């Protein structure tokens, strides 16, 4: 079911369907008010211009079935719309990176260098780009996130029910995600699992940094060796928990940082690979296994390495 919409004067009223129940008010508004800056959305909620069942609510309010949401008609100047529209030529190719799609979800092979959502100095991300490229889509939400510089598999829900079902699978840890990473040196075969708690810190510059700390959250990653090279190893990393920068910090903790990691990497190792042509973090979300949220079918999807990373591996093989 979809939201029922009524427009009266300069106000819109939306009746929340069962499919949309459970989501936060701010996320609902972001989907309905496409192109409206997030700061403006929070402002109209704070000022009470947005109401639920005639009452004021906070942005994190969880919408219920049959709630009536009052939203003022918001007019955005072309200036405010520019960040997404000026980037559309760059992100239009995202359609070519869709690995799987049906009526409730899609799976994307996200290119490196594109954030999954706007923010942190980025005016757009994958989800904003998909919404702009598909204005007819009633619902598009990220199921999970991967870092901007990481490429590979990203799940996007096209229905609220699919989002809820996939989130439940993530909470129950029944989703299996495998990454490929090129790391410094010869990875030791006996290092097949790292359990090291991770703590997030924010530097004065505002940059987020993660470190291993007893005060951190429990974190676990499993590892296996895919291919060895003279001074590097291609490994498979399977995160059991989903902490920020988990694979990047766990490989650093093991003494084998990922190639071209500008936060946790090794400059000398990176310099050699840059001479070979590597210009991005060598971390790729390679495969995912999960239960289809609608049919319960077991899904296994792989995302191939891009041409750039394949070329780097070919050069390393030639050095053997």
UniProtKB/Swiss-Prot annotation:
- Keywords on record: Isomerase, RNA-binding, rRNA processing
Q: Where is the S4 RNA-binding domain?
A: 23-95
User: Superkingdom, according to UniProt?
Assistant: Bacteria
Gene3D superfamilies linked: Pseudouridine synthase (3.30.2350.10), RNA-binding S4 domain (3.10.290.10)
Question: Could you name the active-site residues?
Answer: 147
SMART domains found in the cross-reference section: S4
Name the chemical reaction catalysed here: uridine(955/2504/2580) in 23S rRNA = pseudouridine(955/2504/2580) in 23S rRNA
SUPFAM superfamilies documented for this protein: Alpha-L RNA-binding motif (SSF55174), Pseudouridine synthase (SSF55120)
**EC annotation?**
5.4.99.24
A GO molecular-function annotation: 23S rRNA pseudouridine(955/2504/2580) synthase activity
Query: By its UniProt entry, which InterPro entries does this protein fall under?
Result: PsdUridine_synth_cat_dom_sf, PsdUridine_synth_RluA-like_CS, PsdUridine_synth_RluC/D, PsdUridine_synth_RsuA/RluA, RluA_PseudoU_synthase, S4_RNA-bd, S4_RNA-bd_sf
- What biological-process terms (Gene Ontology) are attached? enzyme-directed rRNA pseudouridine synthesis
- Give the family, as the similarity comment puts it: Belongs to the pseudouridine synthase RluA family.
Please give the PANTHER family that the UniProt record associates with this protein: MITOCHONDRIAL RNA PSEUDOURIDINE SYNTHASE, RIBOSOMAL LARGE SUBUNIT PSEUDOURIDINE SYNTHASE C
Function as written in the Swiss-Prot or TrEMBL entry: Responsible for synthesis of pseudouridine from uracil at positions 955, 2504 and 2580 in 23S ribosomal RNA.
Indicate what this protein is called per its UniProt record.
Answer: Ribosomal large subunit pseudouridine synthase C
Annotated organism of origin: Haemophilus ducreyi (strain 35000HP / ATCC 700724)
């Amino acid at each position: 079911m979809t939201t029922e919409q009524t427009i009266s004067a300069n106000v819109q009223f939306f009746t929340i369907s069962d499919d949309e129940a459970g989501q936060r008010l701010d996320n609902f508004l972001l989907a309905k008010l496409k192109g409206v800056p997030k700061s403006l959305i929070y402002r109209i909620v704070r000022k009470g211009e947005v109401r639920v069942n005639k009452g004021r609510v906070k942005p994190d309010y969880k919408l219920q079935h049959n709630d009536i949401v009052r939203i003022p008609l918001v007019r955005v100047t072309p200036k405010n719309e520019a960040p997404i529209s000026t980037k559309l030529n760059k992100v239009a190719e995202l359609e070519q990176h869709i690995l799987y799609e049906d009526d409730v979800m899609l799976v994307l092979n996200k290119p490196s260098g594109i954030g999954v959502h706007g923010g942190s100095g980025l005016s757009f991300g994958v989800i904003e780009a998909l919404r702009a490229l598909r204005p007819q889509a009633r619902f598009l939400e990220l199921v999970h996130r991967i870092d901007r510089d990481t490429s590979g598999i990203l799940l996007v829900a096209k229905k609220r029910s699919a989002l809820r079902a996939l989130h439940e699978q993530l909470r129950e840890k029944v989703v299996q995600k495998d990454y490929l990473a090129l790391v410094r040196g010869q990875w030791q075969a006996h290092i097949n699992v790292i359990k090291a708690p991770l703590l997030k810190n924010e530097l004065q510059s505002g940059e987020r940094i993660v470190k291993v700390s007893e005060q951190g959250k429990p974190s676990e990653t499993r590892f296996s060796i895919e291919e060895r090279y003279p001074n590097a190893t291609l490994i498979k990393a399977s995160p059991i928990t989903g902490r920020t920068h988990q694979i990047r910090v766990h490989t650093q903790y093991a003494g084998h940082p990922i190639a071209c990691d500008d936060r946790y990497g090794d400059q000398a190792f990176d310099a050699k690979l840059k001479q070979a042509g590597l210009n991005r973090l060598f971390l790729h979300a390679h495969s995912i296994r999960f239960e289809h949220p609608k049919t319960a079918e077991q899904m296994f999807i792989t995302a191939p390495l891009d041409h750039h990373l394949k070329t780097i591996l070919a050069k390393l093989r030639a050095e053997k």
